Amino acid sequence: MKFNYYAFKAIYLHEMDRFKRTLMQSLLSPVLSTSLYFIVFGSVIGGYVENIDGISYGSYIVPGLLMLTLLTQSITNTSFGIFFPKFNGTIYEILAAPISTLEIVLAFVGAGATKTLIVGTVIFITANFFVEVDVTYPFLVIFLLVLVSFTFALFGFLIGLMSSDFEQMSIIPTLIITPMVFLGGSLYSLEMLPQFWQTVTYFNPVVYLINGLRFAFYGVSDFNIWISISSMVAFLLVCVFLVLVLLKKGYNIKA
């Protein structure tokens, strides 16, 4: 079947237009909230904390805070993107249109990842006003940002498909992802923890993402970079499989 570019473009641009209409909430809100972290932890508290692995504390926390934004925004953007058509009934028009399941997923996930990358880029630029950020491997940073954005946009699409109301959609970003980021070494090195808590932290998947991005920024990490990349690719493939299967079966969509 030939790829329906126009149908893909219509959904993608519709999602991007929604991003423009809610610019205050979609862009300014996460940028301002993250800036507060840079001010409090980077500029104020950072002046009283010793360097970690030869990196100033303010600079050290940049990858963790950036990862927090990437995860929450990619999940929220895409989950709401697919849930709204379910909520107002327009999802049936999309399913009835001459567009494949893959094209629907690519359009929503592509738009969600694009919005996340825009927010992430603005936050990265903003971070430079508060702390010194020197990137060691810029191409690896770009690769990881794109990989994380698309992977968790897919995860957000999956959440949107499985959710029956707005409350269910907010549970994972608020009660699961955010605590996992803060407990995953976003504001500290794992070597600062007692041995028991270091072992517990190894079971937190987000810690590998944060360390992967920190390695791309500064060349330091608590884990091998390939562990971070391979775990992310594996999670991406699982999300692709689940989304395509559930959407094709019409899970939580078709009556």
What do these predicted ranges mean?
Residues 1-138, 143-255:
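Hydrophobic transmembrane alpha-helices and immediately adjacent juxtamembrane helices
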